[in-house]
Amino acid sequence: MAPVSDRKTFRDLADPDAAAAAIADLPIAPEPPVEAVPLDDAAGRILAERIDAGIDVPGFDRASLDGYALRAGDTAGADEADPVRLEVVGTLHAGEAPGAAEVDDGEAVEVSTGAVMPPGADAMVPIERIDEIASESGAVSDVDVRTAVAPRENVMPAGADLAAGQRALGPGTRLTPREVGLLAALGEESVPVRARPTVGVLSTGAELVPPGEPLDHDSGQIHDVNAASIAAAAREAGADVQRYSTADDDPEALAESLRSAAPACDLLLTSGSTSAGAVDALHSVLEAEGELLLHGVALKPGKPTLVGRLGDCGYVGLPGYPVSAMMVFRTLVAPAIREAAGRPEPERASVEAELLEEARFEPGRRRLLPVGLVEAWSDATTAAGDPDGDRTPLTYPVDRGSGATTSLSRADGLVTVPAETSYVAPGERVTVELFSPAVRPPSLLAIGEDDPGAAAVMDALDRPRYLPDGTAAGVRRLRAGVPDVAVVAGEPRRDAEGPEIAAWEREWGLAVPAGTPEDVATIEDLAGSDLPFANLASGSGLRAALDDRLDAAGIDPATIEGYGVGLRGHESPARRVLTGDAAAGLGLRATAERLDLGFVPFGTQRVRLIGNPDRSDAAGRSALQGVTDRLPELLASISGYEAA
């Protein structure tokens, strides 16, 4: 058995405080001028209208780590003592179309983080759990898989981060670097410029495309989030930002990009190409072109961080995932920029809050946990020593993974968890460091079904937060006391407990190509056929209704092609029909008509707003009641909707 790839591994991780000190010692000379830079003049502005996602993010099933793509069923029973051997039939990197790299039974394809999942594969095994076997030519011919995986494990499905048609940002939002990153992911443009030291920002990765340009999802292209969000954060810290064109992962191209940018900058920030994968080569380029001071920080997110020098220019290599990049910048880089710019440290604001849901961690690295706030009191808080019943913020985790652009836009602050801590229990007091002193909890927090009617209600409120994570999530988190209101569709097996504030009916069924072709007139037409079907994910009220319909009709879901692959957003299945990737998709009449598709009706489903019984006198609930009194007016423009 012979290793065939030259992967650099993380060995001695730097303490976060030592990493901050190393960055503070970099030669960052002050530069006071302020100028406008394309794309970034929206930071600090107030959003005037709602922004809906026009695309799925990501637009393809994406590998979440370096390893091998395979069929999960082939790994059944695999472990360290009894590995499963698979034939290697290809290699696939980020930014490449799968081509002939297709996975069949007993086969695997080597895949880099962020690459498109090859056809036939439904899971990823990390490289750390693989033994590569070389042929006589030195190329990998087979792999021994030392762990079993489940379908979808280590895979980020298309639309898992943000689904087309979902409400991304609401009117009245102050655009911070978090929101700028989200807008960049959606293809929007612009932010204001103000800074002092000259800071260069360079993204790496062949898969990155500037916002505003079309994406080729078949090649795994995504909008360049980091260039926009990191540049915005550097300006906010006081830097004059110089943006550079995206560089490929090729070592020589990276070296040329660094050589070209460094002389004009006091500090050069890159994102991506810093981890231990074979394609990620910045650490080697930095060693050859300058001085590598450290590689790897005991921080999560943020482990694959680089610090070094390129001549007289300081250098920091940020991780490629947007959340990781922004966390490292905020924690380690921004203080050094502010010091060089002569700016005082910003006023820090923190609050003591009660954690509503448990949080579990792997010990060994300091954890930065994004959290949201709900301003309320609780019986537990009063019993714990607050006899006056003063308002105490409640907090809940919003971490959706380092690759999810929305994690920070949904958050109000961070909880720093010590490296030795592995569990924080519900009800524990935690310190939340707010993203700014101006942060306030939303006027109303709603969690539940992704529904156009609920979105219309939220738009009529001042500063709400609506997390369209599905009926099951809304019910579960309402039981934990997280939202003010749960959006519940249908009759979930475990119903929400609380008063019904408002309700409406929505017409649901199948979205089909325009003209309602005769080959899909009912759900029965899909059973046993080879017609591809686009479904919603489990946890959606619509998905539960369709499951019940099939059960009542005696139809095995396994006989419907694609039934088990769930999409996240309520418009996602219909959009698959629109692009020709599905013959039918589960959805709403409102969606089908908006996209000029045909529609096969199945009936109506009731959607309810269920209030948190412990927050009946909250100000947001009173405002919501006033809005729901106008429910017929709010729903009038949504086809297939009627107030109950």
Language-model region placement:
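Phosphate-interaction motifs
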Residues: 2-189, 351-354, 417
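Flexible glycine/proline-rich
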Residues: 62, 285-435
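Phosphate-binding glycine-rich loops and their immediate beta-loop-alpha structural context
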Residues: 154-270, 274-275, 442-470, 476, ...
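N-terminal hydrophobic or amphipathic helices and topogenic motifs
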Residues: 398-473, 482, 523, 632-644
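Ligand-binding cleft/hinge of the Venus flytrap
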Residues: 456-461, 538-563
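Periplasmic-binding protein-like
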Residues: 505-507, 597-632, 636, 642-644
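Flexible hinge/capping segments at coil-to-helix
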Residues: 512-533
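Ligand-binding clefts/hinges and TM-proximal coupling segments of bilobed small-molecule sensing domains
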Residues: 527, 531-552, 628-644
